[in-house]
Amino acid sequence: MKIPKGVTIAGVFVKIIREDLRDEDHHPKGYFGYYSHERRVIAIDKGLTPAAARDTIRHEMIHAALAMSGLDHLEHFEEEAVVRCMEEIFFPAYERFLRNLNRKKT
């Protein structure tokens, strides 16, 4: 999967970069990516598989949307719960929509 250079969220361009997100012993730090609102950057770990990279970018896009909506004042664990809930609701519905749309085209 080719990673896009960025994505526009709420009219704001957010750059997507790959970083080594492992510690000095090359162990995962416990996360696959992050969103920096100050830098307008989504960073994902260099070692992710294409599917994991896609899922991580989608996850961080939700964090970015929350921040741009002024909803980034939550505690980390609260924001993470909101993001995961939104992932479970929105993305399956969107993927079903795309499948149905593709069926109608054929």
Where are these regions (language model features)?
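Metalloprotease/metallohydrolase-associated module, dominated by Zn2+-dependent proteases
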Residues: 1-52, 68-106
